[in-house]
Structure formats: structure tokens, C-alpha cells
Amino acid sequence: MPTSTVKRTDLIFKKDIDYSAVMHKIMKMGKDEFIEELIDSGLRGRGGAGFPTGLKWKLVKAEQSPDKYIICNADEGEPGTFKDREILDNAAEKVIWGMTLAAYITGAKEGFIYIRAEYKYMQTKLRIAIDRMEQNIKALGIKFKLDLMFGAGAYICGEETALIHSMEGHRGEPTNKPPFPVTHGYLNKPTVVNNVETFVNAIIIAEMGA
């Protein structure tokens, strides 16, 4: 496996972030205010559908459910595609803290990185980064448990409803919408499903502004 196949990089790989400081900033700013900033930034889902990220988080936040979930779709199945692999391999903490930010904003307490089976070699690195995040958020008073879940190689599981069915132990098949995952997602609970790159951009926006 080459150490890097990326010839040109941007803030995703270059920028260092003080994640605790960013979370303090957002906690001081307020959840609704940050959602509006995320909407103003124009960030859309980077997985292909292009749904406004701020609106998705706003919809999940508005749901009156004690159980909500954050899912990172890292089931990168397009032939020749390795964007998510590079981000997870070289900027995993940005992904994890982007998910933590989403959890804080929406009120979710649990999340999963759904990762393609071929990327299992990353799990040790990812679990170390997850453990570090979970230790750091204790001082912030944030409760968020994050785990890894591996796919079985089905291309269709890159689609969010098929991915959720797979996570629940069912055959990974997509379903008609509505209902949407923001209201009836994982375990039929409100769920944010965003792509790897989307979560990274969210934490960068949290630090730099819209």
C-alpha cells in the first residue's frame, strides 16, 4: 500500500486543529447559531447527493427522541475511488471530531463509522483516535460513544438506507423515501448519515467560520 497517492492537498490534510478549543467555541456560540453558520457555508453532502449538511443536522436536532445516531458513510465502493481511504488514513481525527460536533449539535449519544471491509487494516489507528476523542470530550461534558462497523463488500451499501439495513443485520437493500433517515434511520431513530469528507469539512467550518 503506497504511503500516499494524493498529489495535491488542501485544508483536509494540511490544517492542524485544536479540537477541544473548537468545541468550546461552538458551545459558547450555541447550537442553533452554528447550524445557521453551517447552512450559510453552503456545505453539502460530499457523498454525491449534495443535500445541505446544515439542514440535515437541523432536522435531526428538531426530532424529539432520546435516541439519535450519527453515521459516517465510509463504504467507498466506486471503482478506482480512494478519497475516503486517504482521509481516514491521514486525517482520521478530523472525521471523528466532525462526527462529535454533529453529535453535540443534534443531541446524539452514539455513532458509527461504517467502513468497507477492505479498509480493515485501518481499524487499530481509528480505534486509537476514537479512544483519544472519548477521553477528551469528558472534560467538555459531552457524551458520545463511537464505534466501527464493517461492511461485507456490497456496492449498494453505499446508499444510506441500504447501509442502515446492513447495520441492523438485514440484507443491504435500499428503500423508498420518505421516511428519511433524519426521522426514521438506524433502529428507526433520527439519524445523521454523512460522508467522510462532509464531517471533515464541518469541523473545519466550525474552526474557521462560514
Predicted regions and their residues:
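Structural signature of FAD isoalloxazine-binding scaffolds in flavoprotein oxidoreductases
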Residues: 60-72, 194
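Histidine-anchored nucleotide/phosphate-binding helix
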Residues: 91-105
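Hydrophobic alpha-helical positions that pack around
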Residues: 123-210
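Terminal amphipathic helices with adjacent charged low-complexity linkers/tails
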Residues: 1, 110-123, 128, 146
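Gly-rich Lys/Arg/Thr-decorated short loops/hinges at beta-loop-alpha junctions or inter-strand turns
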Residues: 14-19, 72-84, 181-186
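Conserved phosphate/anionic-ligand binding catalytic regions in large, soluble enzymes, centered on
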Residues: 40-59, 153-165, 169-170
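Iron-sulfur (Fe-S) cluster-binding modules
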Residues: 1-41, 108-113
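Short coil/turn connectors at secondary-structure junctions
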Residues: 7-8, 32, 40, 64-68, ...
